[in-house]
Amino acid sequence: MLEEKGIERRDFMKWAGAMTAMLSLPATFTPLTAKAAELADRLPVIWLHMAECTGCSESLLRTDGPGIDSLIFDYISLEYHETVMAAAGWQAEHNLEHAIEKYKGRYVLMVEGGIPAGSSEFYLTVGPHGTTGAEHARHASANAAAIFAIGSCSSFGGVQAARPNPTNAQPLSKVTNKPVINVPGCPPSEKNIVGNVLHFILFGTLPSVDAFNRPMWAYGLRIHDLCERRGRFDAGEFVQEFGDEGAKKGYCLYKVGCKGPYTFNNCSKLRFNQHTSWPVQAGHGCIGCSEPDFWDTMGPFEEPVANRLYATAFDGLGADKTADKIGITLLAATAVGVAAHAVLSMMVKDKENN
């Protein structure tokens, strides 16, 4: 079946292996992941657009090995997606209603974009009847088997919710009373999007989540924990300004605004554009785009957060001041640890000899 659709079995299994690892499953699950993907056309997906830039859809379209055309449309049965579907106007609205009715209680709903709510619903209307985005979201959510908010706009409101939030843009979770899994990012990795669908196919349940309803398998660790420049941070080697010698040598970007220590995501592990790169690799710090209200709380993007948001363990010193000392402190702690280990080893040997 794969060969008929122009997909090499080796490429497909390579993709399945990568998805298995990404979901933190043992390698023995790879054949099961592959089988789930092959059977995934039984799981209809409806994708709605709200107030957004379509960046999350752009990310999805860059899924690789197999690509979006062969994997998503052939195996996951994408029933409705305004960016890639041919229908428009009345026909598009008919297709949506048909999918909701035909797959009632069985489809996965994915929503991209913040949603003007309350008395401001009219700021976003969709389709030939001028239905508000909030009405569309509530209607499609009612009979969904699982609901995913794709991107930070749908998860937390997005940049259109920035103060003073003139359109009262809200996350999907505040528009529907159904459980919502948030997949934030601006945009999220295509593998974080597809991985959640595969998790649902494999286990028939939603993934475990953190306090902000983000899947733990994707958002369980900080950018800082997985960053390839973490060693530079620990050594106290920082870029002082863009273009300086430290920037050329790949030093830590914390002092020029990187929000990696405060941001939970797996960008450094998965990267973007078919695993090509990610912001820190390209020379710019993380802006914290998978965190709630990052548009208001993480700026200015080229300056450290310091002590404005987060208390530290350093007697009130801002994180930017701490960065000056952290390298020396950690190196000293490491030296103490090495010495302690040596003493302990000698004691154990003496005990064994006696």
UniProtKB/Swiss-Prot annotation:
Q: Describe its membrane topology.
A: Peripheral membrane protein
What the entry lists under SUPFAM superfamilies is as follows: HydA/Nqo6-like (SSF56770)
Give the protein family. Belongs to the [NiFe]/[NiFeSe] hydrogenase small subunit family.
Look up the record and name the cofactor or cofactors this protein needs: [4Fe-4S] cluster; [3Fe-4S] cluster
Signal peptide (from-to): 1-36
Q: Tell me which Gene Ontology terms the entry assigns under biological process.
A: anaerobic respiration
User: Can you tell me which residues bind [4Fe-4S] cluster 1?
Assistant: 53, 56, 153, 186
Q: Which reaction does it catalyse?
A: H2 + a menaquinone = a menaquinol
Quote the PTM field: Predicted to be exported by the Tat system. The position of the signal peptide cleavage has been experimentally proven.
Q: Residues that bind [4Fe-4S] cluster 2, according to the entry? A: 224, 227, 252, 258
Assigned EC number: 1.12.5.1
The answer to whether the entry has keyword Signal is: yes
UniProt: [3Fe-4S] cluster binding residues: 267, 286, 289
Specify the protein name.
Quinone-reactive Ni/Fe-hydrogenase small chain
Task: Tell me where it resides.
Answer: Cell membrane
Record bears the keyword Metal-binding: yes
Q: How does it associate, per the subunit comment?
A: Heterodimer of a large and a small subunit.
Q: Which organism is it from?
A: Wolinella succinogenes (strain ATCC 29543 / DSM 1740 / CCUG 13145 / JCM 31913 / LMG 7466 / NCTC 11488 / FDC 602W) (Vibrio succinogenes)
Q: Which NCBIfam families match?
A: hydA
Cofactor note from UniProt? Binds 2 [4Fe-4S] clusters. Binds 1 [3Fe-4S] cluster.
Q: Which Pfam families match?
A: NiFe_hyd_SSU_C, Oxidored_q6
Q: Which GO terms describe its cellular component?
A: [Ni-Fe] hydrogenase complex; ferredoxin hydrogenase complex; plasma membrane
Q: Which residues form a coiled coil?
A: none
**Which keywords annotate this record?**
3Fe-4S, 4Fe-4S, Cell membrane, Iron, Iron-sulfur, Membrane, Metal-binding, Oxidoreductase, Signal
* Broadest EC class assigned to this enzyme: oxidoreductase
Please list the GO terms describing molecular function.
Answer: 3 iron, 4 sulfur cluster binding; 4 iron, 4 sulfur cluster binding; electron transfer activity; ferredoxin hydrogenase activity; hydrogen:quinone oxidoreductase activity; metal ion binding
